[in-house]
Amino acid sequence: MASTMIPYTVNIKLAARTLTGTLNLQNKTAVDWGWQGLIAQGCHSSILIIDPNTAQTIQVLERHKANVVKVKWSRENYHHSLSSPYSLRLASADAAGKIIVWDVVSGMAHCEIQEHSKPIQDMDWLWAQDASRDLLLAVHPPNYIVLWNGDTGTKLWKKSYAENILSFSFDPFEPSNLALLTSEGIVFITDFSHSKPPGSGGKKVYIASPHSSPAHSKPAAAQPTGAKKALNKVKVLITNEKPTAEAVTLNDCLQLSYLPSKRNHMLLLYPREILILDLELSQTVGVVAIERSGVPFIQVIPCAQRDALYCLHENGCITLRVCRSTTPSPNETVTDPEQNSQELVYDLRSQCDAIRVTKTVRPYRVVICPVNENKAVLVVSDGRVMLWELKAHASKSSSNLSSGLPPLYSAVNFCGTPLRQNQKCIPDLSLNSMIGHSLIPGVDSPRPLADQKEVHLKFLLTGLLSGLPLPPFSLRMCPPLTTKNINHYQPLLAVGTSNGSVLVYNLTSGLLHKELSVHSCEVRGIEWISLTSFLSFATSVPNNLGLVRNELQHVDLRTGRCFAFRGERGNDEPAIEMIKVSHLKQYLVVVFRDKPLELWDVRTGTLLREMAKNFPTVTALEWSPSHNLKSLKKKQLAAREAMARQTTLADAEQSSVESSVISLLQDAESKSESSQGISAREHFVFTDTDGQVYHITVEGNTVKDGARIPPDGSMGSIACIAWKGDTLVLGDVDGNLNFWDLKARLSRGVPTHRGWVKKIRFAPGKGNQKLLVMYTDGAEVWDTKEVQMVSSIRVGRNVNYRILDIDWCTSDKVVLASDDGCVRVLEMAMKSASYRMDEQDLTDPVWCPYLLLPRAALTLKAFLLLQPWMDTFTMDITQVDYKEKDEIKGLIQEQLNSLSNDIKSVLQDPNLSLLQRCLLVSRLFGDESDLQFWTVASHYIQAFAQSAQSNESVPEGQAAASHLDICHDILCESSFFQGFQLERVRLQEVKRSSYEHTKKCADQLLLLGQTDRAVQLLLETSADNSSYYCDSLKACLVTTITSSGPSQSTIKLVATNMIANGKLAEGVQLLCLIDKAADACRYLQTYGEWTRAAWLAKVRLNAAEGSDVLKRWAEHLCSPQVNQKSKAMLVLLSLGCFQKVGEMLHSMRYFDRAALFIEACLKYGVMETNDDINKLVGAAFVDYAKLLRSIGLKQGAVHWASRAGEAGKQLLEDLSQTEGTGTESSPADDTDNSLVNIE
């Protein structure tokens, strides 16, 4: 360190970052929560990346020039490997029509897309990622949809529509379906594809405004049953005819979304109600209406894991509504029997606290965690981000009766498997582990199972991020880091705000360190007087005499204590213009607008001098960095040493004590450089209105006037001065800078042509002569040694914000406050503030495997998935044989350490099965494809294992407990799927309101085999209907069909003729009447109606026939033109074709998934052993071993190679040889040969 007494500045490494504030109205919809576990949020033209678990902003992306209007994380619905790694990819769109796809970790733009210059209305990544995982659909105003390749920025196709498009929603069950919400209604597209634009203009339907519905005109004092009945009358809201001009004012539908919890359902959101539509009938089957005094909706998010809705209301309250099961529970008294059967009811199950809404503070958007669906984040216009978590509490069974709601029960499974004895679990892991699935009458037992508890849901606020208040701001960085204060230094930035508070940020973390309410009006300036205290001043609005109330406060950060520095002074006087503290923090100058300046002693708080009335008006002022502290210290030291020598010394021991006393004195002296006993001489210079420079010396309480320098003719009125070493710089109102070299007695004027020089500041650090200059239209950095500009930013040229204040925060970083409400820490080059996330110093570690290098992320996954080579499961990466750089090992260990204790204890629990582990890890990684696969695989491996064990019937209630939820649609068990479809038709039937609807219901009933009910509907056709005769005959036919040969063959002949002549649906119906549903399915498949055929097979065919139909469908899904292999695999899993799935996984090179799947199948005994299977096992295990070797996990490689039998022998030899010679091939060399198929 420095040997001299005077400390010199050392540099501290701070990350470039942006502290953000209030949002712009255009940012309202710019927020998204990705499968990757992070939240992206638009703030003016920047994008914040927030980790919801630790409530930290971990990245800010800056490249947009206009306000960000949409952000969307890419989907993770594909198998991840070294070539398709886990990566943080985000698309953002702005108000000028630009879309940027980001690599979030590096903060770099991956590609930029521009089609038009109007704000992007909506945008989303395609969820089906088998063909490509890079496709992005965007709505370019007014009426275009464009499909982009988000990796290259290439336009694939563009399509225009007749009306203005407001937003769109993809069908989560069918990638070829898309619905557009337009200014006039809805357009349904059924031929969406990445290869070509939709062929037709889509099917248009118009929404009749729900305000004409009885829900809004019900009498105020109606009984609840009456209100419920009124809701039932909201029948049709969808018509194919365009409504008359007076009926359509403006489409006040706020949102349209497909329900991910059940196929072919959609919600429409209006301010006062949510309509649930069944799209097969274009019919309302449920309404969530707000009572007259209730708070209107802004937004709704439908869940996938349960039929539930998260709703955001105008007061910032988030409510969770869960669809009521249609099976009445045994102890439930049905108050309104009609209601129970007539529509879907969404019960309010939980709500969080509202916020205080004002003109400037209102809720903007809510997003929920897509992986677990049990956390919601609310974004408020003032920049606050509130994280609410849903918690389930088991309760006494009687408590629900008071609310009048049927009880909610807990889930039976944890990670897809019933809990074992003493098994650790996380009840709040996800929505489907908190509450059980919705019950289906006739399939599920209405009574809860033995281990199901009644639960209540509550929202808990678990995180809060708050932004800066509204600008303007004044900034001041604390004194710089020096060799003296290095041990206790914190890089603190004080931000004075318009409401009188001072926010102190720690720039290492970017987090708010203290918020102090100091003043009653806007803070005008701040000056630090030590590392832990500062002076700040504020001035009130002038009265009619032009006088104000001045507030000058002394603030101690350690205690939070504030006091008025000028005592009673301050009322009714001219405004303070500036305050300047001397270099050694001994003296303070206070400059007023129309009043002579005051000179104060900072240490004692006493007024040293109030200048005379004739004192010149000050336009700019700066303290000199030179002083006589050094020579004073030398004199003092000499005096002390003289005293010490006069003392007689008893022995040498005493002298050592004495010298330590002296050094203590010196230490004390240097620690308080401005200690009371010593007053060093300091100087300041100032200019008057004529540009004359004055020099004043202050020592103790004596003030001396020094030399005066006449004005420089080339300069205008001087606005600011900066002084460092031998360089003095003056800036004027005309944009001139004048550089004085005091040693060489030279001056040099430079016109910047940028107008008024508002502020100039020298950078800290010994010999650092960089100067930061602020103008009305931007800022520049100058090198005063070379007298040349280093960097520049200008409004309208390279930034779109105005700069309000400037300072240096380290010797090479500047901090700027701007009118978009942000404070930016930038490199000296003043370029974008995005940074590499892996170089950041975070206060709390963040769990996000996507931040790791691709190879390291896969290692972490393999490490968590299975450690069969260990006796116990460890969370310490150093305990396994892992060849990798220590730095990468360290990063992996940081990820492991950042997991919550709950998750760690579950992962280390010996009772956790392989299937549960695979499911849990896919949740932790936010791996959509893995989660889908393991949910279905785990369910059917266990189901087939169970039925193999007990060929006798499955015990009652057991099957019901474990069926897949209806969000898996055709993958569900047939009995459950059938029950759901019957229930659905019953709802449709109650809701029908026209002949069209009745006909559709009768058709569905015939396909489902419900002939009696169908006949009743057919006979309802009125005599004046053109179909009266036809329907009557059909009713007769249905009732008289016998199983006699001749009638069957006649009907079959008629049916096949009908199909051949283009009447497919009618022919299929006839075939179903004579129990020839298998033939019907074949015809449907021949004519390309694959999904309809699968549906019919599930509801009508026995297991063997149904299996044939579904296998053909799976083959079709694998064909190159369809390319939905991942869906085909799920279909095969539901049929128990485990060998086929194992072979597919292996041939698609999903080596990790293949090995773990085959291992699970062998464990549960659902793969019999034969030569083919042994060959598959060997190939899969050896390829997984090679993959593990390539990422450096040698122990794992040995384990799987040894499990591979003959196939693994060669690899085992290679592995033992590398062990013997001690040379391990580097992962990079090994990658290629690890991907060779072993057959």
Curated annotation (Swiss-Prot):
WD repeat start-end pairs: 63-112, 115-158, 358-398, 476-515, 571-610, 713-750, 752-792, 798-836, 898-944
Domain of life, source organism: Eukaryota
One GO cellular component term noted in the UniProt record for this chain: trans-Golgi network
GO biological process: cilium assembly; head development; heart development; intracellular protein transport; multicellular organism growth; neural crest cell migration; regulation of smoothened signaling pathway; vesicle tethering to Golgi
Disruption phenotype: Morpholino knockdown causes microphtalmia, microcephaly, melanocyte disorganization, curved body axis, motility defects and narrow trunk. Morphants also exhibit aberrant head cartilage formation and cranial-facial dysmorphology.
Signal peptide (UniProt feature, chain positions): none
Polar residues composition bias: residue spans: 1215-1226
Compartment(s) of residence: Cytoplasm, Cytoskeleton, Cilium basal body; Cytoplasm; Nucleus; Cytoplasm, Cytoskeleton, Cilium axoneme
Keywords: Cell projection, Cytoplasm, Cytoplasmic vesicle, Cytoskeleton, Golgi apparatus, Nucleus, Phosphoprotein, Repeat, WD repeat
Main localization of the protein described in the UniProt heading: cytoplasm
Matching PROSITE patterns: WD_REPEATS_1 (PS00678)
Keyword Ubl conjugation on entry: no
Disordered, as annotated region: 1213-1239
Job description of the protein: Involved in the Hedgehog (Hh) signaling pathway, is essential for normal ciliogenesis. Regulates the proteolytic processing of gli3 and cooperates with the transcription factor emx1 in the induction of downstream Hh pathway gene expression and gonadotropin-releasing hormone production. WDR11 complex facilitates the tethering of Adaptor protein-1 complex (AP-1)-derived vesicles.
Oligomeric form and interacting partners: Component of the complex WDR11.
Designated name of the protein: WD repeat-containing protein 11
Organism lineage: Eukaryota, Metazoa, Chordata, Craniata, Vertebrata
